[in-house]
């Protein structure tokens, strides 16, 4: 990153006032709303901000693991020969490539 871009970014960040407690509570509430709940646990009690952030981090890590596993599986499928796998006569690796483009 160039020094002029860095200074513009840092000056913009320095000029922004910190979020209010109300804004933070609203952001935490929005974050909690998009996290998967476990058996209504979120409805049973109001989670603290720290708990919501920890759950968000766990969820993001889980999504990364799932994305990695899917990426590995996709790579395996793309390495298959056309004769190895076909769906309704369509070559699966070619089908996957066309979907990715």
Curated annotation (Swiss-Prot):
BP-aspect Gene Ontology terms: regulation of DNA-templated transcription; regulation of growth
InterPro entries in the record: HLH_DNA-bd_sf, ILI2-like, PRE
Pfam families, per the entry: bHLH_ILI (PF23174)
Signal sequence coordinates: none
Gene Ontology molecular function: any one: protein dimerization activity
SUPFAM superfamilies: HLH, helix-loop-helix DNA-binding domain
Sequence segments annotated as region (Disordered): 1-22
Keyword entries, A-Z: Growth regulation, Transcription, Transcription regulation
Location of the bHLH domain: 8-63
Disulfide bond sites: none
Functional summary from the UniProt entry: Atypical and probable non DNA-binding bHLH transcription factor that integrates multiple signaling pathways to regulate cell elongation and plant development.
Family: Belongs to the bHLH protein family.
Name the record gives this protein: Transcription factor ILI2
Organism of provenance: Oryza sativa subsp. indica
Gene for this chain: ILI2
